[in-house]
Amino acid sequence: MDDGVDKQAILDAALAEVIASGIDAFSLERVARRAGVDTTVITRNWGDRRVLLLDAQLSSSAQRVPIPDTGSLRGDLMALVQSMVALSQTAEGRRSMHRFLAASGDADLSDVRIDYWRVRLDELTTVLRRAEERGELRDDVDPAEAIRMFSGASLFDVVFADAPVRPEYITQMLDIFIRGISTTP
C-alpha cells in the first residue's frame, strides 16, 4: 500500500458502505468519503469498485471466519461452522450476506460474488486438505467439492429460510458430514 494509507481502514469503510447503502449504490466516491481519503488513493490502490469490494469481503471473511487448525477433522469443522454461524447471527453479518447474495443488475458486482466464493472456498478447502494429509479423509472424497457441500449445509437456514441456525442442527449436520467423508466411523 503506498502513500502511507491505512489499507484496513479503507477496506473497513468499503464493507461498512456496502452494508449501509447496498451493493448497487456502492461506489469509490462513497467509500473515500467514509474513509476520509481522496478517491484517487482508492483508485491507485484498487483500480475499481469491483476489486475493492472483493478485497474488502475477503479481508472481512479472513478475520471473522478464520481457517482453523485444531489438529483434527472434527475440531476444524466444528470451529469453522461455529465461526460461520456466529457471523451469520449478527445483524451486520446477515445484512452483508443477504446483500452480497442478492441478484444485482451490475455484471461487475455479480462477478465479485463469483470471485469471492471461488477464492474463499479454496481457502476453506485447506481444512480438508489438512485432514487428507493426516489420513482422516477417505480417498474418494474431493476436498473442494466436500467443502462446498459443508458450507451450503452449514448456512442453509440462514440463506434459504432467513432463520437462525439451531445448535442441534449443526451437531447433526456435522455428524452426518463427517461419517460421509471420514476414514473412521
Where are these regions (language model features)?
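N-terminal intrinsically disordered/low-complexity leader segments
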Residues: M1-V5, P185
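C-terminal peripheral helix-coil segments that are non-catalytic and often amphipathic
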Residues: A79, D122-E133, F160-P185
